[in-house]
Structures are given as C-alpha cells and as structure tokens.
C-alpha cells in the first residue's frame, strides 16, 4: 500500500471552482516518472565534463555523438520478464522498452579529443575546449 501526501487548501475562504482541476491534475501526473537523463555539467578553463545518469542501460545501448556544437546522449533499455508456474505453463509475460535522449549545446570543443567512459550507471564525457576557435562575435549596428 502506498501512502500519498494529500495537499489541502488550509484557508477555507480562498477555495475556487478550479481547485478540483488542480487536485485532479496533481494526482494524475504525479505517478508518471520523467523520462529524461539527469545530468551534471562542469566547466573548467580547459574542458567540459558531462556526467549523465543512465542506470540499468547497458553500455552497448548508449550512443554519444557531437555535431555542430551539440552533444547528444541517447540510450535504450529493454526488459523482458517471463514468469512460469511449476509445470512450465506461461502465466505472465511482460515487456518494457525505455528510450532516453538529451542534447546539450557545448560549443568551442576539440571534436577529435572527446572521450567517454561508463561505469556504475554514470556516463562521463570529457570535451576539451578549443582555444583557437573564436567564441564571441562582434556585430556592428547600422
């Protein structure tokens, strides 16, 4: 049994007809888990370090690309669960396919020197900065 926190309006004089819809949407959408990659991005003078959480996704199912200043991380996890009774008769079969993808704008990077590693459900991508590329552009006003 799950315990849920009940949100109630403590001020009885500020009740509006829309409170019902607010409560309904809160109950409806709170049970959905967000399907995105939790990420930390660190920047130093020399590089960017991206740490992305991809728990349960095998290394073989993770793709990392860098194109036009955009780092893209995507992954896919498939779970097949089969339960049989003692006689071997199938009583339940479940499948799940989860896909995640995020993109990050990280310009001024040496594309040939990008490195990635994956351990304990955390993907670490190191993107060395290119000091030869000009970051700021001056635009003249007419």
Curated annotation (Swiss-Prot):
Annotated membrane-spanning segments are none
Q: Which residues form a coiled coil?
A: none
Q: What induces it?
A: Overexpressed in acid environments.
Q: Per its UniProt record, what InterPro entries does this chain match?
A: A-crystallin/Hsp20_dom, HSP20-like_chaperone, Small_HSP
Q: Where is the sHSP domain?
A: 27-142
Superkingdom of the source species: Bacteria
The entry's family comment says:
Belongs to the small heat shock protein (HSP20) family.
| The name this protein goes by in its record | Acid shock protein
- Could you read off the lineage of the organism from its UniProt record? Bacteria, Bacillati, Bacillota, Bacilli, Lactobacillales
